[in-house]
């Protein structure tokens, strides 16, 4: 019975409303933590996982040996690989596609690669103008890897102690 009486007086005096207004007023005059994104940017973690890239060896040969471990381990089924044997008997990829709409950027592909071929770069800002552009092909992945190889190698070397 006492609970009902207390609830009646709380609702009559609008105590819940006043408590909410007090909370709003209290936070109104505190410093803001909003970052105006395009002009200001937060520092990225060294382990940030962004856009994918395929790497090459220093002699120019692509690293991917078409083992398809990254395709098998991908929980979102975002990676599609086709391979063929070359004249020298080694396997190489003929098709390596990543659907960025499906990808959850978990990093399993990067961890499973035995030759460090597929990596996730620090690239955060990219866009698509048409629906089909969300599928990144092998030539595009190799071009990204070639363009950012120095930064990729530097980040991998800094993170090597933690792998």
From Swiss-Prot:
It catalyses: a quinone + NADH + 5 H(+)(in) = a quinol + NAD(+) + 4 H(+)(out). The keyword Cytoplasm does not apply. [4Fe-4S] cluster 2 binds at residues 74, 103, 106, 109. SUPFAM superfamilies: 4Fe-4S ferredoxins. Binds 2 [4Fe-4S] clusters per subunit. It is a peripheral membrane protein. Keywords: 4Fe-4S, Cell inner membrane, Cell membrane, Iron, Iron-sulfur, Membrane, Metal-binding, NAD, Quinone, Repeat, Translocase, Ubiquinone. GO terms for cellular component: plasma membrane. Its EC number is 7.1.1.-. Residues 54-84, 94-123 form the 4Fe-4S ferredoxin-type domain. Pfam families: Fer4_7. NCBIfam families: NuoI, PRK05888.1-4, PRK05888.1-5. This is NADH-quinone oxidoreductase subunit I.
